[in-house]
Amino acid sequence: MVVKVLFFGVLAEISGTSFKHYQDVRSIGDLKLRIQDDFPEIVHYVFRISLNSEITDNDLVLKEGDVVALMPPFAGG
């Protein structure tokens, strides 16, 4: 199973890319651990996670083709 992770803002700078594919992850929590293994400095940043354009939590199960976005805090006005 492959999921696509999108990185935005400072998270894209840390990862050096705007997206990366991850295989064999079962949940958002598992995916976060894999991302932290790949980019250890990411643990120092606050970010929100969306799954297929919906803000989510760690307990959701991932499916083939899901798109996960990591988004730093943002302000609007």
Language model regions located:
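Ubiquitin-like/PB1-type beta-grasp interaction modules and other compact soluble beta-rich domains
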Residues: 1-76
